[in-house]
Amino acid sequence: MARICAITGRRPVKGSIINRKGQSKKSGGIGTHVTTITKRKFRPNLQRIRVKLPNGGTKRMLVSVKALKAGLVEKA
């Protein structure tokens, strides 16, 4: 099962963690330098909930919390 919101289509996106070393120029150093860049994923906050469908039935779906808070989904 893909980790994708059934309502908004939110999915994991790629990003990176950037590690820096050194003292910033602002605080009297010669500047910071990038030492490593590590790949990572930003995952949406998905919850498996029972959703009321327009025809009156219910169905379990993976829904992002952002969609729940916005009122795009009605919990059964």
UniProtKB/Swiss-Prot annotation:
The keyword Ribonucleoprotein applies. GO terms for biological process: translation. It comes from the Bacteria. GO terms for cellular component: ribonucleoprotein complex; ribosome. The keyword Ribonucleoprotein applies. One of its GO terms (molecular function) is structural constituent of ribosome. Pfam families: Ribosomal_L28. InterPro entries: Bacterial_rp_bL28, Ribosomal_bL28, Ribosomal_bL28/bL31-like_sf, Ribosomal_bL28_bact-type, Ribosomal_bL28_sf. Keywords: Ribonucleoprotein, Ribosomal protein. HAMAP family: Ribosomal_bL28. Belongs to the bacterial ribosomal protein bL28 family. This is Large ribosomal subunit protein bL28. It comes from Opitutus terrae (strain DSM 11246 / JCM 15787 / PB90-1). The gene is rpmB.
